[in-house]
Amino acid sequence: MTLLPGDNSDYDYSALSCASDTSFHPAFFPQRQAIKGVFYRRAQRLGPQDDLHQSISLGDRRRQIIINVGGIKYSLPWTTLDEFPLTRLGQLKACTNFDDILSVCDDYDVTCNEFFFDRNPGAFGTILTFLRAGKLRLLREMCALSFQEELLYWGIAEDHLDGCCKRRYLQKIEEFAEMMEREDEEEALDSEDQESEGPSTSEGRLSRCMRRLRDMVEKPHSGLPGKVFACLSVLFVTVTAVNLSVSTLPSLREEEEQGQCSQMCHNVFIVESVCVGWFSLEFLLRFIQAPSKFAFLRSPLTLIDLVAILPYYVTLLVDGAASSRRKPSTGNSYLDKVGLVLRVLRALRILYVMRLARHSLGLQTLGLTARRCTREFGLLLLFLCVAIALFAPLLYVIENEMADSPEFTSIPACYWWAVITMTTVGYGDMVPRSTPGQVVALSSILSGILLMAFPVTSIFHTFSRSYLELKQEQERVLIRRAQYLIKTKSQLSGMSQDSDILFGSASSDTRDNN
């Protein structure tokens, strides 16, 4: 293959000029199966039978450009690139010498006017389709990040992606950005940990204490303290849930209404106080070790902790205020209001169960899926609302005109029946009596099954993908933690060996002097 020698070549670059012949329709060269081992290689490694330029005359070479990408050759007219002057292929028209050409492509064959690009041929097929037809699609079998690199290389903006592919492409990019952000935070924490292993200063001791506190509170797999702390947290959550259930027994409720407190009621209060004390201590430790206090207070799990912990202290304040302001002349109205507030606040204690999301990969996956599938949940709610608004009035009219059913007293009451029926729950409290009403009920059941199946499929795939991502991330964290511990042990062993050598030589010198 003959290549241009450089800027001093007498080669006629007029062959690179673009002739504006609108009646010219070049032959389209379809893609062929790439030979095994040619992927990401230069074209000159292909056999002679793959030379497409042999069938192109010299006049056609002035109007056509031959592109060789990863061993697969394409031919397209120069006029195709007029609409895309800012792309990498469009920049070839502005090249005036060999060095300009090599700044755009990887290699150039003068004899056949062929440009070589050492890029992914599969992705270039999509790029070429965009240049020829104006349609840019995301390949399902190709990584979104690799496709982004190809778009940047060929100089094509992401805005040209079709709507069906753009959302999936942006979602993949956002997921990767979140993963990289988490990895950067972990690397920053690891670097802080390595810095804290330095000289034994007051700042170094404080950094080591904060690192150990962070490992114990946020990383259950970091060691024995983290596992013990996580087990205690789960244990107190379980005890709180059981204690809340016991506090609703009829005997305890009667004592509460009468203003009495037996030994069992006192024990329930003590258990609740101990659990809230543990949760308060845990919240305080998490707040102390958080690098960014504002970001910590904004996190969803922190807000859940506050909503679950604060009702206990508010209840104590309200009880104290109610006992101090209690007067015989006011009657029971004030006490009834205070009792209602206390019952509502105590019901919020069930939010302690959400704290298990800190230690459960399944609950974390559920929250991530809910955040990613807001559009699917909106579609599901929209489908149900439309179907409910259709079947409820229809059944109301049928049952009141034909069967005079006592259950379907109004359209809002029929809304409840439609919700229960379309979600296939079927309590049986409202049953259509007439034959047309039963036909409507059957239609609503089938509609509910079909309408719920469409978004649920997408939600299921998102849940599976999110679970796999979180599991892989957890494995990466464990591997990084193990590597950090191995590195720390090797450094400590090296320091101990150096100290042994130093003190050993010093002691030998002392003996020699003696």
From Swiss-Prot:
Residues 181-196 have a biased composition (Acidic residues). Gene3D superfamilies: 1.10.287.70, Potassium Channel Kv1.1, Chain A (3.30.710.10), Voltage-gated potassium channels. Chain C (1.20.120.350). CDD domains: BTB_POZ_KCNG1_2 (cd18421). SUPFAM superfamilies: POZ domain, Voltage-gated potassium channels. Regulatory alpha-subunit of the voltage-gated potassium (Kv) channel which, when coassembled with KCNB1 or KCNB2, can modulate their expression and their gating kinetics by acting on deactivation upon repolarization and inactivation during maintained depolarization. Potassium channel subunit that does not form functional channels by itself. PANTHER family: POTASSIUM VOLTAGE-GATED CHANNEL SUBFAMILY G MEMBER 1, VOLTAGE-GATED POTASSIUM CHANNEL. This is Voltage-gated potassium channel regulatory subunit KCNG1. The gene is Kcng1. The transmembrane segment S4 functions as a voltage-sensor and is characterized by a series of positively charged amino acids at every third position. Channel opening and closing is effected by a conformation change that affects the position and orientation of the voltage-sensor paddle formed by S3 and S4 within the membrane. A transmembrane electric field that is positive inside would push the positively charged S4 segment outwards, thereby opening the pore, while a field that is negative inside would pull the S4 segment inwards and close the pore. The chain crosses the membrane at residues 225-246, 268-289, 301-321, 339-359, 375-396, 439-467.
